[in-house]
Amino acid sequence: MNSLQILSFVGFTLLVAVITWWKVRKTDTGSQQGYFLAGRSLKAPVIAASLMLTNLSTEQLVGLSGQAYKSGMSVMGWEVTSAVTLIFLALIFLPRYLKRGIATIPDFLEERYDKTTRIIIDFCFLIATGVCFLPIVLYSGALALNSLFHVGESLQISHGAAIWLLVILLGLAGILYAVIGGLRAMAVADSINGIGLVIGGLMVPVFGLIAMGKGSFMQGIEQLTTVHAEKLNSIGGPTDPLPIGAAFTGLILVNTFYWCTNQGIVQRTLASKSLAEGQKGALLTAVLKMLDPLVLVLPGLIAFHLYQDLPKADMAYPTLVNNVLPVPMVGFFGAVLFGAVISTFNGFLNSASTLFSMGIYRRIINQNAEPQQLVTVGRKFGFFIAIVSVLVAPWIANAPQGLYSWMKQLNGIYNVPLVTIIIMGFFFPRIPALAAKVAMGIGIISYITINYLVKFDFHFLYVLACTFCINVVVMLVIGFIKPRATPFTFKDAFAVDMKPWKNVKIASIGILFAMIGVYAGLAEFGGYGTRWLAMISYFIAAVVIVYLIFDSWRHRHDPAVTFTPDGKDSL
């Protein structure tokens, strides 16, 4: 463990902590709105930064680079296709959520269906968070940090003991941010760490390409695009970890769950100052997601060129970072990875606290709980679920098929059934609560049966697409046989300004064509004749960008409108 590495790691970590404390020292975290929703005050850049850093963590940095090391660029679909579902969030989901002024997704489910449906979803999310998602985040973070700093060797302890130690330290740091500071503290820390992640994340492939080119960046690019160039192909084949058919069927559903219904993510946009700010934040995130392959996938391809004999593919990213970055930068990037882990961990920890206190506790245990009591209970539950995650994390030592794919398969047990009942609840106002309960049960049972018990030779994303179709049919049939007595309607709670961003649809079109351009451009390396499609797509995206810049400049002096909770706006 090098002293310069430690100094740069501690220095950047302390800088983030001090700035976060300074920014939130006068923020109200004792109230329900202040702690759980940051007082509904977040603007688009902060929302996008917070969404990105909550999403980008070591399970992706390690897991996706590992998949790219084995299979190539086609795994970028996990990230790039998120642009489609972030457009869904901006145009379909967020307007409905903010109109009702909800604090959690189960709030909507209770209003749309009934209390029992809400409680079922609360328990599903809390169980998945505590025993599946957060342990994987902690374990992958500990694995990466141990590889970077050789903690086990430095302290003369075993690899397993080093993982336990790092998991505990990461868990404690996450508790401090989430349980003590609430969502505002996380959003501020995310913004700072986001800058570091962009800088550090881009430095890894840059120095990696220089290493590939034996000191020349351009020769590194030439080697990447000429030697094993087929690894750059964006179109996944039937035997790849992400076949192209699965990317635009089951994966769209998985990403819709993640970006549009997952409490840990959506809570960032529920805290937006207005619908327009939330939409801008969601679409800005969509743009950033299309740049993710540079940070998450390209390092795996570079590692393939440099180290073709790694014992485990998930070692590709930390090995590359440790070998190509200058010594002080390893410490800095270790601090950035630390911040990314903490952001994801405390983001979902805060959401779990919200769901338990405002859902289960207030509805089952103490229906007369005061707002301050809900905050206290939420903090205590956050501490509890953090301890559970810390205890489970080190046991994920030998995840089959790599960390990333394994995590996605486990989450598939409940995520697509949840997406189904929310979408059907939006567009079919007569579907009753019974349909939601039956669909959740059938969706979970059918997925477990097809994917785990009966060994069909199907990619799990195709299985999810099938379960979605089954759930839709089940809900439509029940809705036809036993419809709601009265159709459900969305009523405005006047929680935030509901005026949409006027350019949201134009920006969405530009993002879609940019995504098509990314796929088409890289498909050339697989022998597909997609050059003209890529050029046309890039041109349309560029026109949209120019229009948005011009429109923003033209209206730069327009007076701001102040929103008031009574539904009347004023200048």
UniProtKB/Swiss-Prot annotation:
Assigned GO CC terms: plasma membrane
Membrane topology field: Multi-pass membrane protein
Pfam families registered for this protein in UniProt: SSF
Membrane-side (Cytoplasmic) residue stretches: 1-3, 96-118, 184-191, 262-283, 346-380, 437, 482-505, 554-571
Keywords: Cell inner membrane, Cell membrane, Ion transport, Membrane, Sodium, Sodium transport, Symport, Transmembrane, Transmembrane helix, Transport
PANTHER family on file: SODIUM_GLUCOSE COTRANSPORTER 4, SOLUTE CARRIER FAMILY 5
Family recorded in the similarity comment: Belongs to the sodium:solute symporter (SSF) (TC 2.A.21) family.
Protein name per its UniProtKB record: Uncharacterized symporter YidK
Organism this protein belongs to: Escherichia coli (strain K12)
